[in-house]
UniProtKB/Swiss-Prot annotation:
UniProt feature, compositional bias: Low complexity: 244-259, 342-351
Protein name per the record: Envelope glycoprotein
Note: Filoviruses entry requires functional lipid rafts at the host cell surface.
Region annotated Fusion peptide, chain positions: 529-549
Organism of provenance: Lake Victoria marburgvirus (strain Popp-67)
Segment forming the signal sequence: 1-18
Sugar-modified residues: 94, 171, 190, 202, 207, 219, 223, 255, 310, 323, 326, 337, 344-345, 350, 360, 389, 397, 408, 487, 564, 619
Chain segments carrying region Mucin-like region: 277-455
Transmembrane domains' residue ranges: 649-669
Assembly description: Homotrimer; each monomer consists of a GP1 and a GP2 subunit linked by disulfide bonds. The resulting peplomers (GP1,2) protrude from the virus surface as spikes. GP1,2 interacts with human CD209 and CLEC4M (collectively referred to as DC-SIGN(R)). Asialoglycoprotein receptor (ASGP-R) may be a liver-specific receptor for GP1,2. Members of the Tyro3 receptor tyrosine kinase family may be cell entry factors interacting with GP1,2.
Comment block on domains: The coiled coil regions play a role in oligomerization and fusion activity.
Length: 681
């Protein structure tokens, strides 16, 4: 009788506490993906392929609506296949795919882009799968779209278009770390999952997840999160096999979002019992390098989260962050009294970056996970950016949210109260005498729209060349450089050589007399000496000649100033046109890369729309140089111009000839007079 009562009590207690979504059963030996669908393809030893089940269209009617792709080869169209809801959507794809001769069948990633391809957030999908029911983790992994192009969004309750697949490539160690713990469900994890890759700095293993050391068990009454831990618990080597605990839920009853919205960052998925469970994920913008092989033992550090925009989930969730004096996990409020914080940032052309640095000042070795009672009694805190920032945050519901703390403002960045700097804090770098353009790691291309995240300190340098300089953050330490994204600085050649200033060069406003005016008719007569020579003689002409020369010099100075201003204006126009041409070419190369399998931009748009931008910057620079040479050229002589007899030497020659003719006439007259006198006398 006592045993029966105890058994009934256990059943009742177990009924109160919701069962985990997943039951994980480990096998003895891990199993790897040793083969692919077709062809002679090579397998990368560092990856593990995971398949997921998607809910979508059951029959593909056209290539653009195909729900599966079997071969990921360049130029191979997708195969039209029937798709049954609940079917396991496995796709054979590895990072390294070559033909028997060793030639790669995939497109090469674009240059100047690190850690390619990229992912964005954690997303949920519906259905059953031997690995994970209702969850698609691409932490340290990538959903692939087309040929090595990363798909940033998985859709829920939508028809899957051509190329949208449900396969993830992750590190095998990470795979075992995720799926080797029994009795824990990982559907709700407040993970900062943007651009998480491993790096090694002289043997020191680091990452920026900040949330994989102590994963909490998911419960319907408490949306628990995980606290960062430097030394994770030992992981078993067995490969897990996940079994669903209940029947699959109906996809139509779980679809609560707008069906017309394809860019969903927050997606609600149901539990095994068919009820909806809200959750919220927080994306983080981190700057970290990619190691070719991921370390087997992670050591998480606090990350630098950033609230991503375009959050379209209408459910409720929580966003938590660790306190600087308490490194244990901060539990969230119950689902009926929670607040989901979304960033109101619908414009992609946002030139401000919300950077929040989280720093734990206590020792990592003393960190421990709080118990369930301690978590329920601890308050939950959320950090809200101030309203003055360009990127604003607001609550998605009108319920009373948790306690908010205003962060400190430091150099335009939002930071939590922390006395020590964070090595993973995002730095905005100013390149003096360069056009500095910062791009965030994870963006598809550095010069696409909305990717300029830093102010511009532009001071052009004369005689510079057009270069691409890929460097780390200036002023940062070596450890920060390991996590910093490359700064693509574009230095363009704008200004030609400029000689030293001469007298009346017009370079400065004070070079020329401001009292420049046009002479009247009387003043012209005075300058010509027509009115005063008969009275005062030609000696007084020098006074008026000096005034005439001064006025002429002012005219020359004003002309030089006008030439300099014209040259500077042309230089500004050349700067703008050169920059626009550079950006246009970069965007054109990016579009050509995306449309390579269809023949490129000219093939898709047609030859009439395939135009090029002619580079005339050299011609304009030559004209600017010529203007400056002309206005700085010092003229010599009288400069009367005209034919040879009116030139400088021509005038002297003419005077000499006239003088000789005059002497000859005088001699002739003298001779004539003597002859006439002789004959008369």
């Amino acid at each position: 009788m006592k045993t029966t009562c105890l058994f009934i009590s256990l059943i009742l207690i177990q009924g109160i506490k919701t069962l985990p979504i997943l039951e994980i059963a480990s096998n003895n030996q891990p199993q790897n993906v040793d083969s692919v669908c077709s062809g002679t393809l090579q397998k990368t030893e560092d990856v593990h392929l995971m398949g997921f089940t998607l809910s979508g269209q059951k029959v593909a009617d056209s290539p653009l609506e195909a729900s599966k792709r079997w071969a990921f080869r360049t130029g191979v169209p997708p195969k039209n296949v029937e798709y049954t809801e609940g079917e396991e959507a496995k796709t054979c794809y590895n990072i390294s795919v070559t033909d028997p001769s060793g030639k790669s069948l995939l497109l090469d990633p674009p240059t100047n882009i690190r850690d390619y391809p990229k992912c964005k957030t954690i997303h949920h999908i519906q259905g059953q799968n031997p690995h994970a029911q209702g969850i698609a983790l691409h932490l340290w992994g990538a959903f692939f779209l087309y040929d090595r192009i990363a798909s940033t969004t998985m859709y829920r309750g939508r028809v899957f278009t051509e190329g949208n697949i449900a396969a993830m490539i992750v590190n095998k160690t990470v795979h075992k770390m995720i799926f080797s713990r029994q009795g824990q469900g990982y559907r709700h994890m407040n993970l900062t999952s943007t651009n998480k890759y491993w790096t090694s700095n002289n043997g020191t293993q680091t990452n920026d997840t900040g949330c994989f050391g102590a994963l909490q068990e998911y419960n319907s009454t408490k949306n628990q999160t995980c606290a960062p831990s430097k030394i994770p618990s030992p992981l078993p080597t067995a490969r897990p096999e996940i079994k669903p605990t209940s029947t699959p839920t109906d996809a139509t009853t779980l679809n609560t979002t707008d069906p017309n919205n394809d860019d969903e960052d927050l997606i609600t998925s149901g539990s095994g019992s068919g009820e909806q469970e809200p959750y919220t994920t927080s994306d983080a913008v981190t700057k970290q390098g990619l190691s070719s092989t991921m370390p087997p033992t992670p050591s998480p550090q606090p990350s630098t989260p950033q609230q991503e925009g375009n959050n379209t989930d209408h459910s409720q969730g929580t966003v938590t962050e660790p306190n600087k004096t308490n490194t244990t996990a901060q539990p969230s409020m119950p689902p009926h009294n929670t607040t989901a914080i979304s960033t109101n940032n619908t414009s992609k052309n946002n030139f401000s970056t919300l950077s929040v640095s989280l720093q734990n000042t206590t020792n990592y070795d003393t960190q421990s996970t709080a118990t369930e009672n301690e978590q329920t009694s601890a308050p939950s805190k959320t950090t809200l950016p101030p309203t003055g920032n360009l990127t604003t945050a607001k609550s998605t519901n009108n319920t009373k949210g948790p306690t908010t703390t205003a962060p400190n403002m430091t150099n335009g960045h939002l930071t939590s109260p922390s006395p020590t700097p964070n090595p993973t804090t995002q730095h905005l770098v100013y390149f003096r005498k360069k056009r500095s353009i910062l791009w965030r790691e994870g963006d598809m291309f550095p010069f696409l729209d909305g990717l300029i995240n830093a102010p511009i300190d532009f001071d052009p340098v004369p005689n510079t060349k057009t270069i691409f300089d890929e460097s780390s953050s200036s002023g940062a330490s070596a450890e920060e450089d390991q996590h910093a994204s490359p700064n693509i600085s574009l230095t363009l050649s704008y200004f030609p050589n400029i000689n030293e200033n001469t007298a009346y060069s017009g370079e400065n406003e004070n070079d020329c007399d401001a009292e420049l005016r046009i002479w009247s008719v009387q003043e012209d007569d005075l300058a010509a000496g027509l009115s005063w020579i008969p009275f005062f003689g030609p000696g007084i002409e020098g006074l008026y000649t000096a005034g005439l020369i001064k006025n002429q010099n002012n005219l020359v100075c004003r002309l030089r100033r006008l030439a300099n201003q014209t040259a500077k204006s042309l230089e500004l126009l050349l700067r703008v046109t050169t920059e626009e041409r550079t950006f246009s070419l970069i965007n054109r190369h990016a579009i050509d890369f995306l449309l390579t399998r269809w023949g490129g931009t000219c093939k898709v748009l047609g030859p009439d729309c395939c135009i090029g931008i002619e580079d005339l910057s050299r011609n304009i620079s030559e004209q600017i140089d010529q203007i400056k040479k002309d206005e700085q050229k010092e003229g010599t002589g009288w400069g009367l111009g005209g034919k040879w007899w009116t030139s400088d030497w021509g005038v002297l020659t003419n005077l000499g000839i006239l003088l000789l003719l005059s002497i000859a006439v005088l001699i002739a007259l003298s001779c004539i007079c003597r002859i006439f006198t002789k004959y008369i006398g």
